[in-house]
Amino acid sequence: MKQEILKNLPKIELHCHLDGSLSRPFIEKRLGRTVRPEELSVSENCTSLNEYLEKFDLPGRCIMDEDGLSGAAYDLLSQMNEENVCYAEIRFAPLLSETKKMDSRKVIEAVIRGMEQGKKDFGIEYGVIVCAMRHHSAEDNMRMIKTAREYLGSGVCAADLAGAEALYPMSEFMDIFTETKKMGMPFTLHAGECGNPQNIIDSINVGAGRIGHGIAMRGNQEIQKLAKKAGVGIEMCPISNLQTKSVNSMAEYPMREFLDAGLKVSVNTDNRTVSNTSLTKELEFVQNNYGIRDEEIFRMMKNAIDTAFTDDSIKEKICKMLK
């Protein structure tokens, strides 16, 4: 598929972090100064996840008040509109934006306001995914998820767990997400972005609807069978995973393997600005490097719709746009 066709294709994005995807003009406006591209995005020679994470400092400063949060949400939907994303689930960590004046309720409401304005102006259907952070206390994470649960179906669509997977394995968070499931809150979980496949097993067993990344089940047919049987979506973020060295080389990236195993793979950006990417660029990348056929692009969009945290009426609407 040519780039222009890919750009105009109606697209679905399920794994996109708000703070890692703010546009340079938005960040410059918020900071009141010119920002160099290298302050925001990693180069092709990114050496590690730590180098990658350094790029979140500036955008993080831009979302510490309600105007910044609302503006950030609108800014991201504006970017998505430029490449015909018709449904998007945007994730962020409310606790990272909390201040003495702004609790997680106000944080979540501010993001929803920006999303609603973006939906009104661009026609993009959206859902907000709230991220619990691995380094935060169980009490704080649970407090945030309980608050977010009040907005389920009114902007919020799911919860997530993000942060340093290597330091905090999934086994430490089973109680939180068992409780989240009891509350009727859907969730996706970052798991297998680094080398521990047990995190994927634990995530599936606790009831995750989707897995963020899932790279660690490469070559492991047993876990792949478990994921397939559970019907979980696999949110793959190719360019980001290569930059953070989740895999050592392009040849090791398991997109073709996962598709051939019948997993519900979707393609995502992860962090548009930090990775200097877009959904169009990601799709072009996987076609050029992994022999992804045109019909498989549509299959992955269908996988994204099938595993989206939204109601059937919106799924039907998006399906019609793809035909």
PLM regions and their residue ranges:
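Short HxH-centered metal-ligating active-site micro-motif
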Residues: 190
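Metal-cofactor-binding active-site regions of metalloenzymes
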Residues: 1-185, 194-199, 205, 209-210, ...
